[in-house]
């Protein structure tokens, strides 16, 4: 098993959710799982809505990105989480 870089797309529940606070919660949650958060980008979508794209580095293992996605989806201000890119390092 190797190391993978994963780009996730995290959608907040509304445009009113503070981008910086959500990014900090995402980073804290990921790092509490002993996963490295390399970068976080925030991209505007429409009507004030935005998406947060954390880039994480983790060990390739059974279950893939599911544990991380579930942990982030359980955050109060998160509507949805999906993997948009996975590559072996």
Curated annotation (Swiss-Prot):
It comes from the Archaea. SMART domains: EF1_GNE (SM00888). Disulfide bonds: none annotated. Pfam families: EF1_GNE. It comes from Methanococcus aeolicus (strain ATCC BAA-1280 / DSM 17508 / OCM 812 / Nankai-3). Gene3D superfamilies: 3.30.70.60. Keywords: Elongation factor, Protein biosynthesis. GO terms for molecular function: translation elongation factor activity. NCBIfam families: aEF-1_beta, PRK00435.1. This is Elongation factor 1-beta. Promotes the exchange of GDP for GTP in EF-1-alpha/GDP, thus allowing the regeneration of EF-1-alpha/GTP that could then be used to form the ternary complex EF-1-alpha/GTP/AAtRNA. InterPro entries: eEF-1beta-like_sf, EF1B_bsu/dsu_GNE, Transl_elong_EF1B/ribsomal_bS6, Transl_elong_EF1B_B_arc. Belongs to the EF-1-beta/EF-1-delta family.
């Amino acid at each position: 098993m190797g190391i993978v870089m994963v780009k996730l797309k995290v959608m907040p529940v509304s445009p009113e959710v503070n981008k910086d606070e959500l990014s900090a919660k995402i980073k804290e949650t990921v790092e509490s799982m002993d996963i490295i958060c390399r970068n976080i980008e925030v991209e505007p979508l429409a009507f004030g809505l935005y998406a947060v794209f954390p880039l994480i580095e983790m060990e390739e293992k059974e279950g893939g990105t599911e544990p991380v996605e579930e942990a982030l989806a359980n955050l109060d201000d998160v509507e949805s989480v999906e993997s948009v890119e996975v590559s072996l390092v």
